[in-house]
Amino acid sequence: MSVKRFVCAAVLAACCGMAVPARAADTIETGLIGAANAVEWPMYIGLHKGFFTDAGIKPDVIYVPTAPGLVQQLAAGSLDVCDIGVVEPIHAVARGASVGILRISGAVSPYAIIAKSDIKTIKDIKGHTFVIGGLVDINRVYLERVLKAAGLKDADIDITVAGSTSARFAALKSGSADVTMLAPPVNFFAEAAGFHSIGNMIDYTKDLPFGSTDVSRAFAEKHKDAVLRFVSALDKAYAWFNNDANRDGAIDILVDEMKNSKRDDVAKSYDFLRKIGFFPTDGTISKKHVEALMDEMTAIGDTNGKVPMDTLIIAGVSKVGP
């Protein structure tokens, strides 16, 4: 049917009291890490509050165990978008993968450094096993900052890997690790289980972004309008979270998503994430902060140098600032 005919038909249908068929929502395969968690709060808000539905978007949420696995599926086209540590799209682009950053999803690190009772300070981690998310992910960059602050080197600790916050907590409980970094509300679960915090990662990494929402370039080029609507819905979800009037509603949403979480722990998570300004409302990609992160990655041999910013962003979609 031509546009003119469709408009005429719509007008006639309206006059006759007939319903006009709604446009089908665009499905976007959306990858998240591990299982439901506080870092993905805006995604759940967008789903529960209807922001995606209003934008004509239907996210098909798929959980993947590890960060490298997520970005591999994004690069392969199995996923359309994903939310992950900022180092992952940098790694992918450096290897020639056709992916890009849509927005910053986590402005700063949300991690608490959680340890067994005999470890009192970060200097006490010497000789202990520290479990992180991956040897080439955002956890590794953050760990390097902690080691420097403690006057330690890699050789002073044993480093093991568990892909998600819940997996790292499991390693701590099993005794296979002595210290780790956990995002809320899992850090509060750990404290209730007898472990304790020896510091917040933000104290060592204020200048380094944590997470980004990323997209397959092939998908973005073919479905630019859908991607713009997806980002717009996400922006609304971030703004909704950052409105204190929505505190109770936000807590209800994450309790529902995480199923077995205690409301008090989720409430603590909301207050903590609001306090540190974790969720950026506009998602602007700071060139200065991303380049600082790439400097850290280069310093530990994670990359061979900086990736040009124009290869990391999606022109006409990503917001980029100084």
Predicted region positions:
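Short, glycine-/small- and polar/acidic-enriched structural segments
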Residues: 24-154, 159-162, 166-171, 178-184, ...
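Conserved C-terminal helix/tail region of periplasmic/extracytoplasmic solute-binding proteins
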Residues: 291-322
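Sec/Tat signal peptide C-region and signal peptidase I cleavage site
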Residues: 18-24
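Phosphate-coordinating loops and pocket residues in cytosolic domains that bind phosphorylated ligands
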Residues: 127, 192, 314
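N-terminal secretory signal peptides that target proteins for export/translocation
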Residues: 1-3
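Secondary-structure end/capping motifs
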Residues: 221-303
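Bacterial N-terminal signal peptides
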Residues: 8-18
